Each structure stands twice: as structure tokens, then as C-alpha cells.
Amino acid sequence: MISYPNIDPIAVSIGPISVHWYGIMYLIGFAGAYLCGMYRAKRSNGLWTPEMVSDAIFYGALGVILGGRVGYILFYQFPAFVDNPLILVRIWEGGMSFHGGLLGVIIAMFFFARRYNKHLVDVTDFLAPFVPIGLGAGRLGNFIGGELWGKPTDVSWAMIFPNDPLQLARHPSQLYQFALEGVALFCILWFFSQRTKPRYCVSGMFLLFYGIFRILVEFVREPDIQIGYIAFGWLTEGQLLSLPMVIIGAGLIMAGLKLNTFPKASTSK
């Protein structure tokens, strides 16, 4: 068993203000996406400008935060929301959903695409390779916060998390997700998109591989206590939400290869 590196989840405290590592990880994710976007924009043959990248990151940040919070409440805390709707705005208490954040980003990118007269999927194809930076950083934030741990296990790298009331040796599933949803997914998408691919393909690859990785990790991740298993004694909410991503992702890749259309330059309205 490996000792859990008990890091204070509060990185900096200035008087009554506390800056949590989880919040810093969000900033790292947005900053990393911005830098990668600027790098790719210079090599886009005029399809993307620095202004477009800056605006896209801003729109995306709004989508992630608003969608992530609303999704968490609807997917994981709906009964509590019905009893007390004010929990929706209590962001400081924690609780964000990837799937809600994804829907929020898609909605935000719809408005961004309209502003710049771009095809929505051209926008998501450009941005998709940068998303794993934020996903990986977020999972490190989960690990530092000692939350979203895995199931009990006897593997040699198991850890006991200080916030676990049962104090059992568990899979460090946050690190598995960091490795798969962060590092592996970034490498796959970054190298796949090095050369311009047909429309839909990069977005499809993101949905396909994220869905696969999330479904796999859910087998060793402790399900949310307020939900438990959805069916069969093993199907989790995360797997149920990720399965459509795999199906849609595969469909987008096939559609992209069949249509074989490519993004076109555009200007703001």
C-alpha cells in the first residue's frame, strides 16, 4: 500500500479568503487550453485568430462552470435541489459534473460559432484536443482534495484517503482518470489532429475515447453514495451518461469520413 500524500486542499489563505487547489486546477486547465489554442491558431492558415481563441476560451469557461454545476445538481443531487433550490448557487460547497460541463460548453460554443459565422463542429474539432488538459488538472484536484476515490482493493498501490469514513485501502481512481482522461486522451487527440481532419472526426474521437475511458474507470471507482448503482449491481450513473458518448462519437467519425468535408475560413459578424 502507498501512503496518501495528505496535501492541504487549501493552497493559499489570505485573511478570510481561501484559494483551493481545485480552483487552481481549473485555472491551469483554462490556461493550458489557451496556450495550446494560440499555438494551433498560428498554424491554422487563417482559420483561427488569437482573438477567436481568447473568446472561445471565455465562452468555454462559462459553459464549463455553469453547465458543470447545473449538471451536477440535476444528475446527482436532484432530490436535494427539489427540497432546497438554493443549493444550485452554493458552488463553494463543491460539486461539478463533467457531463453537465460538456453540455454547457456545447451550448456556449453554439453562440460562439454564430458570432464568428463558423460551423459549430469546426469549433468543437479545433477545441477538443485542449479539453483533456482541464480534465487531467481537475482529476489531480480531486486527488488532492481526497474525494471521488475508488473501490476497496488489495493492490500494492492502494491508498487510504483521510476523508473516507471506513478508512479502507482503495484504488486511487482519480489518478487513473488523470492518466486516461488527461494524459492519454490529450496525446490521442493532439497527434490525431496534427493535420486537418474531415469535419466531425476530432470531436468524434474525443467523445469516443472519453466515453470508453470513463466507463472503464467507473468499474473501480466508488459510486456516488446518494445514487449507488443504477442497475445490475454494477452500472453507475457515470457509465450510463458515457455510453451515449461512445455511440455518438463513433457515429461522428463515420459521418466525417463519409462526408469528407473540411473547415472553411470565416469572419465575425
Curated annotation (Swiss-Prot):
Pathways involved: Protein modification; lipoprotein biosynthesis (diacylglyceryl transfer)
GO cellular component: plasma membrane
GO MF annotation list: phosphatidylglycerol-prolipoprotein diacylglyceryl transferase activity
Keyword Cell membrane found: yes
InterPro entries recorded: Lgt
Positions with a binding annotation for a 1,2-diacyl-sn-glycero-3-phospho-(1'-sn-glycerol): R139
Annotated compartments: Cell inner membrane
UniProt-listed GO biological process terms: lipoprotein biosynthetic process
Membrane topology term: Multi-pass membrane protein
Domain of life: Bacteria
Keywords: Cell inner membrane, Cell membrane, Membrane, Transferase, Transmembrane, Transmembrane helix
Enzyme Commission no: 2.5.1.145
Keyword Nuclease appears in the UniProt entry: no
Chief place where the protein resides: membrane
Bilayer-spanning residue ranges: 10-30, 56-76, 91-111, 126-146, 172-192, 200-220, 237-257
Top EC group: transferase
Pfam families: LGT (PF01790)
Protein family according to the UniProt entry: Belongs to the Lgt family.
Biological function: Catalyzes the transfer of the diacylglyceryl group from phosphatidylglycerol to the sulfhydryl group of the N-terminal cysteine of a prolipoprotein, the first step in the formation of mature lipoproteins.
Entry protein name: Phosphatidylglycerol--prolipoprotein diacylglyceryl transferase
Source organism of the structure: Marinomonas sp. (strain MWYL1)
Gene this chain is encoded by: lgt
